[in-house]
A protein has these predicted regions:
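Transmembrane helix boundary and interhelical junction motifs in multipass membrane proteins
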Residues: 6, 10-28, 105-116
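Membrane-interfacial helix-loop-helix
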Residues: 1-5, 31-108, 112, 119-126, ...
Length: 157
């Protein structure tokens, strides 16, 4: 049940930035002895990935919405969009590197990068895989640091 609630909370936190996944994971880690560190980190990352995929898909499909299309009708904006897509097509490692940095470190904000990735039509599979790996490592680092700190305090106390 703990892992299911973790998944749901992390999906919600990916959709609503006011819900903090890291704080939830720390609270669960401190209060539950049934969920292991890596399981908690992976399930949290899976929930975050699902939520960010919703943002990605919404942004990807937004380019076909009437009011968005009208804003992109100017040659200058279409040229800029084509230029960015071209840059990323020439250097596929660049957007995935920024995405991994965002997923693992949090800068730039992953929500912003998810929207840009969708609008620039980055690979859906590449996006999901990179976010899943980055978030798993981020959450494992936070929970591992917390575990280390609680052990240290127990030895000192």
């Amino acid at each position: 049940m703990t892992l299911l609630l973790t998944f749901a909370t992390c999906v919600l936190s990916a959709l609503v930035p006011l819900v903090n996944a890291e704080a939830y994971l720390v609270a669960v880690s401190l209060t539950s002895s049934t969920a292991g560190l890596w399981a908690l980190a992976f399930v949290g990352a899976l929930g975050q990935t699902v939520g960010k995929l919703i943002w990605y898909e919404a942004a990807r499909r937004s380019l076909s919405w009437g009011w968005v299309r009208r804003r992109l009708e100017t040659p200058q904006r279409q040229e800029a969009l084509a230029r960015w897509r071209g840059r990323f097509a020439e250097r596929p490692w660049l957007p995935m590197s920024v995405l991994f940095l965002s997923a693992s470190v949090g800068l730039p904000p992953l929500l912003v990068i998810a929207v840009l990735a969708g609008q620039l039509h980055l690979s859906r599979v590449g996006f999901a895989f990179t976010v899943l790996v980055g978030r798993t490592l981020r959450f494992a680092a936070i929970l591992g640091g917390l575990d280390w700190l609680t052990e240290l305090l127990a030895r000192l106390g």
